[in-house]
């Protein structure tokens, strides 16, 4: 079983965009947080399925670190 970190971003027009940093281009959307997470799981599964079909390596979150930077408002 694989685990991936996801980032949810609330959109001004409503809903949530989900990004999977370890899987480039794996982005999805949901109207609610719950739906966004559900859609992320589906997107990750389809992404990995496509990688397997093409014989490509499956990236993991191993060695991935998260850090929040605060910068001045210039």
Set out the residue ranges of the language-model regions.
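A short, exposed loop/beta-hairpin motif centered on an aromatic-Gly-Thr core
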Residues: 24-33
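Hydrophobic residues in alpha-helical membrane-spanning segments
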Residues: 22-25, 60
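Short, charged, surface-exposed hinge/linker loops at domain edges
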Residues: 1-4, 38-74
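Short, flexible helix/strand-to-coil boundary loops that buttress conserved ligand/catalytic motifs
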Residues: 20, 30, 48
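Extended aliphatic helical segments
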Residues: 18-20, 27, 71-74
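Intrinsically disordered, low-complexity regions
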Residues: 15-16, 31, 56, 64
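Short aromatic-glycine-(Arg/Gly/Cys) micro-motifs in beta-strand/loop hairpins
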Residues: 8-23
